[in-house]
Curated annotation (Swiss-Prot):
Enzyme Commission no: 2.7.7.6
Keyword RNA-binding appears in the UniProt entry: no
Main location: cytoplasm
Designated name of the protein: DNA-directed RNA polymerase subunit Rpo10
Catalytic activity: RNA(n) + a ribonucleoside 5'-triphosphate = RNA(n+1) + diphosphate
Keyword Lipid biosynthesis in record: no
Function: DNA-dependent RNA polymerase (RNAP) catalyzes the transcription of DNA into RNA using the four ribonucleoside triphosphates as substrates.
Annotated cofactor note: Binds 1 zinc ion.
Cell compartment(s), UniProt: Cytoplasm
Length: 72
């Protein structure tokens, strides 16, 4: 869904780097490893959090139930 706030293994905060990571890959055409090097993500446990993440938030939004009192 969304990137976890911290690395599951070491606890380092990583979520603040997600948008810059996506920008480096999509807009600047960098390889994922190069983007992580530039962001200073050097621990393999933190790198796996980025490399294995699948962003499914947009795909799941149509299936969320409407909230009570909210217009449809």
């Amino acid at each position: 869904m969304i990137i976890p706030i911290r690395c599951f293994t070491c606890g380092r905060p990583i979520a603040h780097l997600w948008e810059k990571y996506v920008e480096l890959i999509e807009e600047e055409g960098m390889e994922p490893g190069e983007a992580l090097d530039e962001l200073g993500v050097d621990r393999y446990c933190c790198r796996r959090m980025f490399l294995s993440h699948v962003d499914l938030l947009e795909e799941s939004l149509p299936y969320t139930p409407p909230r009570l009192g909210m217009p449809r």
